[in-house]
């Protein structure tokens, strides 16, 4: 049996946490041969609820669950962790301006970034799920100067998976047969899901669908506003699908994608006209525990416009919290 890996989950007593923890403990994220020790972080007022979740985790008798730590202190939560899923974030309350939301999360992710910097394993893989995910990931990265910026990622896998399912429904093909989908930009309604390069059994998805009006007026708005549609229908934000996307993201990053494209929010290297350092969704392939962006894709006029639109939103978010970094 391998030595256990320490995995931190923040917001562990929350809705996404509840959908996530049992799947991590069962081996779905890091493999069925990899024991884990869960480091569970949540607010002081959530510690009792967190104990209840831990009781349930114990009651599953997962062979791979080698231990658990519950805490409200990020310095304890991130000690020696190899994987950190930053799920907890300040939700937007009624009447709250986006600027205030950015500010509140700025404080949270500055503290967590610093704690990761001081206590996590040097090769820690960080995934930010809590919204606004790209900007929160950027804040955490900036607050951890001793860690490689490449260690920090934002979750665009939910947008990616949402886009896959819409394409499968439109073409009548199985979702697993779709390859080479890309999602660009921010995890927000401005994201740009791009199937120009996608194939199903070697055939072009763009040629199969062959409908630019559907792409612009149905597909992109449906994927972009899917989170809002779920809140409208269920009265709660998407939790199980977000947890599923987080599992997919980390599993692929750690275990590899076998040459398949997936989408991750990563610090830009300056390619595709995206300024260096911006936390931006791009297509990647993963192998040997590292992601490599897919290079050399042609960007047409419509794509450029959509990619610049989502970039502008990211730069606006970043400007709103720039004062946190002097």
UniProtKB/Swiss-Prot annotation:
GO BP annotations, alphabetical order: malate metabolic process; tricarboxylic acid cycle
Keyword Cytoplasm applies: no
Keyword annotations: NAD, Oxidoreductase, Tricarboxylic acid cycle
MF terms (GO), sorted A to Z: L-malate dehydrogenase (NAD+) activity
Active site: 187
SUPFAM superfamilies from the UniProt entry: LDH C-terminal domain-like, NAD(P)-binding Rossmann-fold domains
Listed EC numbers: 1.1.1.37
Binding-site positions, substrate: 92, 98, 131, 162
Binding, NAD(+): 11-17, 105, 112, 129-131
InterPro entries per record: L-lactate/malate_DH, Lactate/malate_DH_C, Lactate/malate_DH_N, Lactate_DH/Glyco_Ohase_4_C, Malate_DH_type2, NAD(P)-bd_dom_sf
Catalysed reactions listed for this entry: (S)-malate + NAD(+) = oxaloacetate + NADH + H(+)
Keyword Cytoplasm in annotation: no
Described function: Catalyzes the reversible oxidation of malate to oxaloacetate.
NCBIfam families for the chain: MalateDH-SF1, PRK05442.1
Annotated family: Belongs to the LDH/MDH superfamily. MDH type 2 family.
UniProt protein name: Malate dehydrogenase
Natural source organism: Chromobacterium violaceum (strain ATCC 12472 / DSM 30191 / JCM 1249 / CCUG 213 / NBRC 12614 / NCIMB 9131 / NCTC 9757 / MK)
Gene name in the database record: mdh
């Amino acid at each position: 049996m391998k030595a256990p890996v320490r995995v931190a989950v923040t917001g562990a007593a929350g809705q996404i946490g509840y959908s996530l923890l049992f799947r991590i403990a069962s081996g779905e994220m890091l493999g069925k041969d990899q024991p884990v020790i869960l480091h569970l972080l949540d607010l002081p007022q959530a510690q009792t609820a967190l104990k209840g979740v831990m009781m349930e985790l114990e009651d599953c008798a997962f062979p791979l669950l080698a231990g658990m730590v519950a805490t409200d202190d990020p310095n304890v939560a991130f000690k020696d962790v190899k994987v950190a899923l930053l799920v907890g974030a300040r939700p937007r309350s009624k009447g709250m301006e986006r600027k205030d939301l950015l500010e509140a999360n700025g404080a949270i992710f500055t503290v967590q970034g610093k704690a990761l910097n001081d206590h996590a394993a040097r090769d820690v893989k960080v995934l930010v799920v809590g919204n606004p995910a790209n900007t929160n990931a950027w804040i955490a990265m900036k607050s951890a100067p001793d860690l490689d910026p490449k260690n920090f990622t934002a979750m665009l896998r939910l947008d990616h998976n949402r886009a896959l399912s819409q394409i499968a429904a439109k073409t009548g093909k199985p979702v697993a047969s779709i390859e080479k989908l890309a999602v660009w930009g921010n995890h927000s309604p401005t994201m740009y899901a791009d199937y120009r390069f996608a194939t199903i059994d070697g055939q072009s998805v763009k040629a199969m669908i062959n409908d630019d009006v559907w792409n612009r007026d149905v597909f992109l708005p449906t994927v972009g506003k899917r989170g809002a549609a779920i809140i409208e229908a269920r009265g709660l934000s998407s939790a199980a699908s977000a947890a599923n996307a987080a599992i997919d993201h980390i599993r692929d990053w750690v275990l590899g994608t076998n040459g398949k494209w997936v989408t991750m929010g990563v610090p830009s290297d300056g390619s595709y006209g995206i300024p260096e350092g911006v936390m931006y969704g791009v297509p990647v392939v993963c192998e040997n525990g590292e992601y490599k962006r897919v290079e050399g894709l042609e960007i047409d006029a419509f794509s450029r416009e959509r990619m610049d639109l989502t970039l502008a939103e990211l730069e606006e978010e970043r400007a709103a919290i720039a004062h946190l970094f002097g």
